[in-house]
């Protein structure tokens, strides 16, 4: 069964932190950040957690579509910064939304999370009466070492998502997908390490959980992104029976403007096909692709019938590609 995307929505913290703001807390400059990443500012949450942002997205999707909460079959949240280890962020959203009949779960695939969540959602849109909320949301700021300019300047908080409906018509959105995991390189990007520090059996007192800051081997991730991701996009498009020239928009993970520019060049496609909004939001991980999609739809840059490649890549290491006709 394929799906149709019937609505998009996003939610962002109100607090804007510019590159100049960061110079007050770390040794950096606007020029240093912008020249290396393309980022000018990002949203940093002051009070909202991941579930709060995702709930705003879910409610907006319902409001825009006119679909009743009782019609929602499933809620899938892609995040690497959940409120808790358990319950899932999706379960919190389900409860606060009042979607009592819906089942809910999280997917953790870092910056590929939204594309993996779309893949999972396909199994639950079996009839036109099936509606599924798929949301990517992150509050990465709570996991950052704000003294480390190599990582702290890159990220921002936010959430965005889509409302899917099952369809048997020729108006379906889904065309093809390609998911890749390279677990042998999983140590290149890690966050929230929870080691077994001591046996817990028989111990009195609260269990100790080790939380570590977000850490990334920048050079290795960049090489992975340029070495593997363009080839994966090319292969996914070919496997779908399409050519790169037929793709109207490449919505790739908003990690770095120089990286995206290089990808466009490697695929021999015009940069105009690779929209960017990272200058305003930074790297929002699982929220990155749906945030860009929602913005492009809202501004009428993406229209019904446009052929789009959604490509996430990052921790895992993972690559997730969904080819859709919006």
Swiss-Prot record:
Subcellular localization, as worded in the UniProt entry: Cytoplasm
Ranges for region ACP-binding: 254-258
Pathway entry: Lipid metabolism; fatty acid biosynthesis
Catalytic site: 111, 253, 283
A Gene Ontology BP annotation from the UniProt entry: fatty acid biosynthetic process
Keyword terms, alphabetized: Acyltransferase, Cytoplasm, Fatty acid biosynthesis, Fatty acid metabolism, Lipid biosynthesis, Lipid metabolism, Multifunctional enzyme, Transferase
InterPro entries: ACP_syn_III_C (IPR013747), ACP_syn_III_N (IPR013751), FabH (IPR004655), Thiolase-like (IPR016039)
Catalytic activity reported: malonyl-[ACP] + acetyl-CoA + H(+) = 3-oxobutanoyl-[ACP] + CO2 + CoA
Quaternary data: Homodimer.
Name under which the protein is recorded: Beta-ketoacyl-[acyl-carrier-protein] synthase III
GN (gene name): fabH
